[in-house]
Regions:
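Terminal amphipathic alpha-helical/low-complexity segments used for targeting or macromolecular assembly
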Residues: 1-27, 88, 94-95, 99-119, ...
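Flexible, glycine/small-residue-enriched loop-and-beta-strand segment within the central core
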Residues: 10, 32-44, 49-140, 171, ...
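Helix-turn-helix DNA-binding module
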Residues: 160
Length: 203
């Protein structure tokens, strides 16, 4: 006799389209235990997996997720100012990505129960470029761009934009060393295997 499963499973591409997502690619899995707000402003590329207890809140902003992206369990993405995760990027467990934040200086009132005219909310888009990986329980604040190929160690606070192809760690996140680029050859091999063109790159 098979043992009963203790998980509620995943939504897949056809189901997600029926739920009203802006766009959904192929081979997409989103845990049924996720909390999703504003799915009409959320786009999912190909080969995406989002695990249990993750919050995706696009609201009136947007969350655009590329292809070959994994978002582990217990992550939180607040997309009021816009969030973009490019191809081959990933978030480990418990990462928080904020594209809007209250003013903590005491110059204004805070929290969503207060009328907006009494608040000074910072709203700015967040972008994780290709091959960015963010370690567990890290926090990314509004207006940050993490450059292509950068990696961020666990428990880091990213309050400013990070340059491509370095390893970062700390509170605030500091540059430690260059990151190896061997993964680009592996990406090219995967794309060739699947008959997909190489991505265009800026001059």
């Amino acid at each position: 006799m098979p043992r009963p499963t203790l998980t509620s499973g995943y939504w897949h591409t056809d189901e997600l389209l029926n739920l009203g997502f802006k766009a959904v690619g192929k081979d997409v899995s989103v845990s049924r235990d996720c909390c999703i707000v504003g799915q009409q402003n959320i786009s999912l590329g190909d080969h995406v997996r989002i695990d249990a207890m993750t919050l995706l809140s696009a609201g009136s902003g947007y969350i655009d997720i590329g292809s070959y992206v994994h978002i582990a369990s217990f992550c939180s993405l607040g997309g009021a100012g816009g969030i973009t995760l490019e191809d081959f990027s990933g978030l480990s467990q418990g990462v928080r990505v904020y594209s809007a934040s209250d003013d903590y200086s005491g110059k204004s009132l805070t929290n969503p129960c207060v009328p907006s005219r009494y608040k000074a909310v910072a709203v700015a888009p967040v972008r994780l470029e290709r091959h960015v990986i963010v370690g567990s329980n890290s926090v990314i604040l509004p207006g940050v761009t993490i450059g292509e190929g950068a990696s961020v160690g666990a428990l880091s606070l990213v309050s400013r934009s990070l340059e491509p192809w370095y390893v970062y760690f700390g509170t605030p996140a500091r540059r430690l060393k260059p990151r190896c680029r061997d993964l680009l050859a592996l990406e090219a091999a995967l794309r060739q295997e699947e008959g997909k063109p190489a991505p265009s790159r800026p001059d």
